[in-house]
Amino acid sequence: MGIKRETILILDFGGQYTQLIARRIREANVYCEIVPYDISPEEIKKIDPKGIVLSGGPASVYVKNAPKCDKEIFELGYPVLGICYGVQLMTELLGGKVAPAPVREYGKTEVVINNTIPLFKGIERDTIVWMSHTDQIELPPPDFKVVASTENCPIAAIANVEKKLYGVQFHPEVSHTHRGTEIIRNFLFEVCDCSADWTMDSLIEQTVKEVRAKVGNHKAVCALSGGVDSAVAAVLVDRAIHDQLVCIFVDTGLLRTNEGDMVIETFRKNYDMNIIRVDAKDRFLSRLKGVTDPEEKRKIIGNVFIEVFKEEAMKIGDVKFLVQGTLYPDVIESGHGISSTIKSHHNVGGLPEDIGFELIEPLRMLFKDEVRQVGKELGIPDEILYRQPFPGPGLAVRIVGEVTEEKLEILRLADSIVQREMKRFGWYNKVWQSFAILPGIKSVGVMGDERTYGYAIILRVVDSMDGMTADWTKLPYEILESISTSITNEVPGVNRVLYDITSKPPATIEWE
């Protein structure tokens, strides 16, 4: 949002760990931004960063059309740290030589470092690092010294201490590198002389000022879903403009048991906010009648949501701004770096820009963990801050096939049992998501002395850091047994429970 502060720039060459680099820097209370690798020297000078990091990437620097930054970047006087592909590119551009490695290194590797240089200050001479490379430096650039080596990689790090140009072949941002955090902190504080001024307090204060200046005397609306992002965005903007903000909670009829009541009660109890609750259950269900295609269901839900939201906003009058809980990974994914992929997020709170309002996105430079930190500072209750992610289209994407009131009731009850048992066993906050799915298949069963023909419920529990990839959770058998027994005993019409043991990829977390 245009906040002027000490900044580290991360040039993105498509590495799988680029966002992890950013998180490690932010954890040190230093602000950073991920930018396209082809950013111009002029743009960099305008930003005037404290330092620059060149990320890893899948390419080889010596092949045609390999992504390369402008060589002039190394002449601007800013400290630079190249990581993996980044150090190879630095080598290539500054007159050294990179070639395929005779022995490719993957995984934990012992490295011997020169700990007299600022980058490795306080690090043991022998330490463990995470390697993942198929190329290596054969000859460092002129005026660079070799400052680390492994058994198979004689040039594992290089440095031009005078010009503050450093490069490492390993990945300090990955937790498997034993002293990786210290190496990154050394770059920030020993090399770049950062002052650790990135705090949630300062962010809140600055954002409040900027929102006030932008909104002026106009009104803003926010689609409140009860999720973490919309909640933090709403409370933050409410702190800035209070009476000028109206939050609209659209009850789609596709929510979990008592979810609408819980959200409204939580906000009204803790905050003096303008909240409008719209009951649009019948409208959503009637439009979904007979629809079985998952993408069609999503589109219908999104369109109806926009219709309802816009109608309510028009009733308020003089609304100029729309508050959205966009996060930094969304900004990166829809950006221009080579690792970018344009994704259609299924968050129905993500309204299109052409809805007729100017956007306010107070969280757009934050990662999820930082959003929760801001929420903590704002006093948002834990039951909101630590809720598991829930898809925008709600239970509609957890019912395979047509959505009906009967199926919604079955799924709500089954899902409430999953949440109850996960909390009872102390596992709710240990996993990324835990929920029930109604796949629309029926099977034969026996209850008492009678044959039954009932629905199956699928249990889905996954571990993840960010939802981009996920592993199925190895739940203890006693929890699985308790969930299964409770569902088949308490949910009418269900006689079987299955456990989905597929990771993402190849599957997605949600079924539709």
Swiss-Prot record:
The active site is at C84, H171, E173. The keyword ATP-binding applies. Gene3D superfamilies: 3.30.300.10, 3.40.50.880, HUPs (3.40.50.620). Transmembrane segments: none annotated. GO terms for molecular function: ATP binding; GMP synthase activity. Its EC number is 6.3.5.2. One of its GO terms (cellular component) is cytosol. NCBIfam families: guaA_Cterm (TIGR00884), guaA_Nterm (TIGR00888), PRK00074.1 (NF000848). HAMAP family: GMP_synthase (MF_00344). Catalyzes the synthesis of GMP from XMP. Homodimer. This is GMP synthase [glutamine-hydrolyzing]. It comes from Caldanaerobacter subterraneus subsp. tengcongensis (strain DSM 15242 / JCM 11007 / NBRC 100824 / MB4).
